[in-house]
Structures are given as structure tokens and as C-alpha cells.
Amino acid sequence: MSDNDTIVAQATPPGRGGVGILRISGLKAREVAETVLGKLPKPRYADYLPFKDADGSVLDQGIALWFPGPNSFTGEDVLELQGHGGPVILDLLLKRILTIPDLRIARPGEFSERAFLNDKLDLAQAEAIADLIDASSEQAARSALNSLQGAFSARVNHLVEALTHLRIYVEAAIDFPDEEIDFLSDGKIEAQLNDVIADLDAVRAEARQGSLLREGMKVVIAGRPNAGKSSLLNALAGREAAIVTDIAGTTRDVLREHIHIDGMPLHIIDTAGLREASDEVERIGIERAWQEIEQADRVLFMVDGTTTDAVDPAEIWPEFIARLPAKLPITVVRNKADITGETLGMSEVNGHALIRLSARTGEGVDVLRNHLKQSMGFDTNMEGGFLARRRHLQALEQAAEHLQQGKAQLLGAWAGELLAEELRLAQQNLSEITGEFTSDDLLGRIFSSFCIGK
């Protein structure tokens, strides 16, 4: 298998459909057109033609589109054949094309990979293609499209350019010490570095929201049996997703619901009631509950308001609070306010949000929805946002750390070489986002998650 091979793949989903598309990219795309169509279509014009087998019989008829390189998606010669979407028809046409030497089925994401390697897209834009396809909400789709159009890349490239200018001054001072280039006399370098740090912080904030749009927030509902966890899951989901009874321990396994709150994806997880297990099945369910809690972005600590007047979670169940991972955000949810007569709404206790509601009637659930949205800093009015992946957040975080260390060198003992190295490492971290500095292993992991025809 060679990267210089001509590749072919179905660009439409498998199965029956009104239209099926085969995409071909590479040096042999011209030969495919001449062999299957009998001619080379006019560039960038739709041509209605028969698709012929080796013996001249017609396999199908449809639209052919010819995009000669470098003016194509991949930067190579590209041919698209749009025929009927029957699996048998597409399979016959694919087999016909593969009889031509040096053609092979494309690897997942190989079309996008070639576009990246041929400088048609940077890495963040290429990833945005997969994110646009996988978008689970309107806002996620719009943000993915912004990334595809270069919104995220432009912000990163601006930071890289600013760091380039800073590095020029710093390294000039190191290489030409006799020229008396003074960094500290007028404070310009410190001011420029502070500007870069501030810009990076703004990008990080937007990237965190973009990651939330893409990944979603994992919220685990936990508490003792019969506290109303499954009722709350149903109230948030807006449907009967979980069985609700008065029998303690009804929920034995983990239940998952994917919902959206004003465009924000949430993964709501209902767990088995936490207590001493009465049998092996319940024990396994409780173990799984703790596994989910340890991986959560937030825990909703469900409390049956009819069993205690306490509101501090450390007082209600100190053993549970002690076992939670450090820094895991907790929201205390006092349920059954319709029975206790408590005032609905949100307050704070010992640094934790406290919400009083009735999962059975739905009263107060909207307060919880707003709290979940606000707790992640989600802004539904954000314009021009972009999607971000975990690797982007890691790269931005590492760049921020290097800039802070570089600032310490500038304001401290003035170790010029160390400052220059911190700036270089920060620039390298940022360049990993767009692919200017990227390992082959990372490229393989990214593009292997794409669709075959992308």
C-alpha cells in the first residue's frame, strides 16, 4: 500500500438510497474516467453519462464530476460518480474500477488526509469535517462549520505569529549581546508577552466551550435507594427512560440518556442506589455506579427530603462525600419538595449548589437545567465559536504553562536561553493544533476515526 496509489471509496452511507456516490482521487482518476465513462468530463461541470463495464454493457447511468488537481478537495485529480444508491449497483461499479491497476480502496479518512498533506486544509480544519458529520445539535454543527472555514486555525495562527515576533527579539539579544538590545528598559517585551498570554487565555476559554459542545458533559445522578434518581433522569430526559417504583433497588445497572439543554449536549447517567448490596447483581451495579462517578464531570447528589432536614452533604452522608474524587463538582438535589413543602429553587451550602425540586411533578427541574448549563460556562449566544477536541485543550494548556514559565524568566533572573526555549515550546504546542508540527502517529490516530469516503 502506497500513499501515491489512486484511491476509491463510497462517499455515501452504506445501504439503499436514492443516490450513491463513488469518489476517486489520484493519478489514475483520469484513466478511470476514460475507462468507465468513455471520455473525460468537462472540469467542474455535471455530465450525465452511462457507467460501463469492461464488455461495454451499461452498469448504471448518472452524473460524473471531474476536478483536475490541484483545484480539488484533495489537491489531486478527483472523479466523482453519482449513480443510483443500490448496494449491488455500487458494488459492481466499484469492482469495475478496481480492475484498473494501482487502484485500491481508501483507508478511513484518507481523502481528508491527502487534502491535509497537499495543504488544502490544516489539521484543525480536517478534524472539523468529522466533527461536522458527527454534530449532535444545531450549535455544534455551526461551530464545526466555523472550524472548517478556519475560525479556530486563524486564532491559533495569530498566536503563533505573535510568538514568532517575540522569539526574534529574544534570540537577537542572545546572539548579539554586544549590541546592547535592552528588553526591560521600556517594558515592551513584557507587554507583548502579556498580550499573547491574554489572547491565549481567551482562545482557551472558547476552546473549552467548543470541547463541551463536541464531547458533552457527563453528569452522574447518585445517592441512596429510593431518593428519586430515576425519576430525575426521566424528568431531564422528558420521557420514561427508567422504571420507577417504590421498591428500593429497582435500578440495578447504569442507565444513560443523551439530552440537549439549549444546544449543550449532556450525558445523564442514572446509577444503582448506593448501600450495602443484598445480592451479587446489586453489588455489581453499585461497583459500576462508582466507576461512573469517578469519571463524571459533575455529580448530582440526590437526597430524599422526607428522610432528613440536613442540607450539607458532609452531614447527610460523610462516607459518600469522603469517597468522591477530589475537586469533583457536586450539586446537592433535595427531592420530594412536593411532599416536604420546601421552597423550590437554588441556594448554596458549604461551597456546593443546593437545589430543591420535585422530580415526580417536574417542579424546580428547570432550575437544575439552568444550573447545569451555567456550571460549565456555556454561552448560547456565542457567535463565531468553534469546536475543539481534547488534544487541542491539552496543547493550549501546555502552551500557557510554557508562557508563564517564560514570563518568570523575563521578570526574574533574565535567563535569555531559557526564555527563548519556553517561547519555542509554546509555539510548538500551538503548531500541533494546525498540524505544522505533528507526529505521524498522531495523524494516523486522527484520520483513522473518519468515514471511509472522507
Curated annotation (Swiss-Prot):
Gene3D superfamilies: P-loop containing nucleotide triphosphate hydrolases, Probable tRNA modification gtpase trme, domain 1, tRNA modification GTPase MnmE domain 2. Keywords: Cytoplasm, GTP-binding, Hydrolase, Magnesium, Metal-binding, Nucleotide-binding, Potassium, tRNA processing. K(+) binds at residues 226, 245, 247, 250. GTP binds at residues 226-231, 245-251, 270-273, 335-338, 358-360. The lineage of its organism: Bacteria, Pseudomonadati, Pseudomonadota, Gammaproteobacteria, Enterobacterales. Its cofactor is K(+). InterPro entries: G_TrmE (IPR031168), GTP-bd (IPR006073), GTP-bd_TrmE_N (IPR018948), GTPase_MnmE (IPR004520), MnmE_dom2 (IPR027368), MnmE_helical (IPR025867), P-loop_NTPase (IPR027417), Small_GTP-bd (IPR005225). Homodimer. Heterotetramer of two MnmE and two MnmG subunits. GO terms for molecular function: GTP binding; GTPase activity; metal ion binding. Coiled coil: none annotated. (6S)-5-formyl-5,6,7,8-tetrahydrofolate binds at residues 23, 80, 120, 454. Mg(2+) binds at residues 230, 251. GO terms for biological process: tRNA methylation; tRNA wobble uridine modification. This is tRNA modification GTPase MnmE. Belongs to the TRAFAC class TrmE-Era-EngA-EngB-Septin-like GTPase superfamily. TrmE GTPase family. Binds 1 potassium ion per subunit. NCBIfam families: mnmE_trmE_thdF, PRK05291.1-3, small_GTP. It is found in: Cytoplasm.
